[in-house]
Amino acid sequence: MKKSLIALTLAALPVAAMADVTLYGTIKAGVETYRTVKHTDGKVTEVKTGSEIADFGSKIGFKGQEDFGNGLKAIWQLEQSASIAGTNSGWGNKQSFIGLKGGFGTVRAGNLNSILKSTGDNVNAWESGKATEDVLQVSKISAPEHRYASVRYDSPEFAGFSGSVQYAPKDNSGANGESYHVGLNYQNSGFFAQYAGLFQRHGEGTKATVGEPVEKLQVHRLVGGYDNDALYASVAVQQQDAKLAAAPNSHNSQTEVAATVAYRFGNVTPRVSYAHGFKGTVAKADGDNRYDQVVVGAEYDFSKRTSALVSAGWLQEGKGAGKTVSTASTVGLRHKF
């Protein structure tokens, strides 16, 4: 009897050691069609059409923790892209880190989402492949969202408020240079508000003119909305500005807004988003970088893990005789594990 108990205990040891390690991921893909019509001086000068089987950003990851007692834990995560279209490779190319979590908050170091990117789910709730992301996702306002080799601190929540700070050293950021990130969040009874700021002394910017590097990049974003079991609504406002490195007193700047509304009816969740980019400054002159975008679609949940996706988008960049109009649509499937 004692031998049986000893054998059973020894057999359970590896299981106990693995108990705090979780395998997770998302597989998502679909069929896409797209069309882009470019105008010059009021005439159609270029038409592009296409269709493809596209991966929507599938991923696989491992995460775990070790409890030291007294509320202190070591936490880690290793996450990577896992395209079913065979377009991604490498380990840790998505959010991956190691850190500590306790009553003081959470400290992590690794390849981390920027604080700006952490607000992204309330700005862009859509799925698509790379070829159509400008049309089927609210991606123009999301362009400054990146991951950085950085260290990040997230505070615990106090009366609905929480904050974050993040630093990416210059040596880990390549040509982008060092960057600083701050964030403030509030939530109460389904209502939420978020602020995220990015400050980068040297970087390519997101509204940069080709061949003209920028510096002193700033991005400020405010997001507010309401989220309960059925109704979701959000509004985002973003301002970004950068100085052209080789041109004194010149700036690339733009203000953008986006709004999304969704409502769940049983297993079906229809959704609509609208985004607008106001006329900004490119180099020293007013730039025609205005745009308008509409995305409509719905999700049907077969279960808690598997959903069917359908969406269509329209994007107009510029105005009048020099505008470019793009449309796209997709039907896809997503499974979470």
From Swiss-Prot:
Entry keyword Endoplasmic reticulum: no
GO molecular function, one term: porin activity
Gene3D superfamilies: Porin
CDD domains: gram_neg_porins
Keywords for the protein's UniProt record, in alphabetical order: Cell outer membrane, Ion transport, Membrane, Porin, Signal, Transmembrane, Transmembrane beta strand, Transport
UniProt GO cellular component terms: cell outer membrane; pore complex
Organism domain of life: Bacteria
Pfam families: Porin_1
Main location: membrane
Membrane topology annotation: Multi-pass membrane protein
Single biological process term from Gene Ontology: monoatomic ion transmembrane transport
Subcellular location(s) per record: Cell outer membrane
Signal peptide range: 1-19
NCBIfam families attached to this UniProt entry: porin_porB_Neis
Family stated for the protein in its record: Belongs to the Gram-negative porin family.
Subunit organization: Homotrimer.
Function (record text): Serves as a slightly cation selective porin.
Name the record gives this protein: Major outer membrane protein P.IB
Organism this protein belongs to: Neisseria lactamica
Lineage of the organism: Bacteria, Pseudomonadati, Pseudomonadota, Betaproteobacteria, Neisseriales
Gene: por
